[in-house]
């Protein structure tokens, strides 16, 4: 799905997404990402929600956003409290959503000037 937004050079904006890719400022990625408004997207080595560990959130924690939006794939799933305990201890809120809702919510909060992070889990690309 293409989003009709006004991307800026200043902020990292989700400009499109499908089940197996995400587009940030018109650049397509086919791997999981961590996105923050003022930082270039970072590859996130997570390809399966069920394999998440607390360690996977350290890169987000280091950026100290006010809120992490976790895109859990094609359907909404909730992270176990022990996985996000270190984020909560640092007063970083965590919201879990399917990827489409996560992308839309990130854009809205980013446009409002909120210090938000988006972590999107994409499936491993199929190799032939």
Question: Residue spans of the language-model regions?
Answer:
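Short, charged beta->alpha transition segments
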Residues: 53-59, 105-106
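Short acidic loop-to-helix transition motifs that present clustered carboxylates
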Residues: 99-104
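Active-site-proximal loop->helix
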Residues: 82, 108-109
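Mid-chain, well-packed structural core segment of small domains
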Residues: 61-97
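Short active-site-adjacent helix-start/loop capping segments
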Residues: 42-44, 76-79, 105
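Non-catalytic interface/targeting segments
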Residues: 1-55, 63, 111-128
